[in-house]
Amino acid sequence: MRAGQPKITGAKITGAIIAGGQSSRMQAGGVSGDKFLQPLGSAPVIAHVIARLQPQVDTLFINSKGDLSRFAAFGLPAVKDIAMNHGGPLVGLLTCLAHASPCRLLLTSAADTPFLPCDLASNLIRKQAETGARIILACSNERVHPIVGLWHTDLVPDLEKWLQHAEKASIFWFAKHIGFEVVNIPLAHAPRLAESYDPFFNINLPDDLLKAREINEALQA
């Protein structure tokens, strides 16, 4: 693992790693357990996410709707989803926004994206300062990544209302409802890889895990 760059000064920011999902596609492919706890080099996948994000934020915690004891080894607070009739990733986002509310800004990421840019926070914060937008989402290869974003914590009432009435229970549609800006992040390179890779590459399938191990080995070279 390689640590991220220090956060930029002048902005208090909380980070949240959202460890949602059932890992069903990974398990259907014959790999048991949570995808974010699969070994990647010398550490689990989520440990790489922590190493990338922790230097970029003031505080960092993990969010999950499952058994929080799974995260005891990582030395971070773990926060369980708020109990709601509604389900899905928006509940995780609401939980994170509410937990982070003493801070003005929340940076979110999924737990299965081990190659996050080391300057992610600074790029998103800079865009927020330029535009004043309450939501800034990461984008790469012409694809928006709604789970990777910078959120103003005053969005809690908006999201609570959205969850009461929304027909489309996705983070993207909530962000579209509020309005968001994007930061385009270029593809990344490693000396021993023939092709560039997406820094927001996430692990869902056994083949994804194999590819992640290839990228990780190249980065450690």
From Swiss-Prot:
It is found in: Cytoplasm. GTP binds at residues 18-20, 35, 63, 81, 112. InterPro entries: MobA-like_NTP_Trfase, Molybde_CF_guanTrfase, Nucleotide-diphossugar_trans. It holds the Pfam family NTP_transf_3. GO terms for molecular function: GTP binding; metal ion binding; molybdenum cofactor guanylyltransferase activity. Mg(2+) binds at residue 112. It comes from the Bacteria. It is an enzyme of class 2 (transferase). It catalyses: Mo-molybdopterin + GTP + H(+) = Mo-molybdopterin guanine dinucleotide + diphosphate. Its cofactor is Mg(2+). GO terms for cellular component: cytoplasm. GO terms for biological process: bis(molybdopterin guanine dinucleotide)molybdenum biosynthetic process. Transfers a GMP moiety from GTP to Mo-molybdopterin (Mo-MPT) cofactor (Moco or molybdenum cofactor) to form Mo-molybdopterin guanine dinucleotide (Mo-MGD) cofactor. Monomer. The N-terminal domain determines nucleotide recognition and specific binding, while the C-terminal domain determines the specific binding to the target protein. This is Molybdenum cofactor guanylyltransferase. The lineage of its organism: Bacteria, Pseudomonadati, Pseudomonadota, Alphaproteobacteria, Hyphomicrobiales. The gene is mobA.
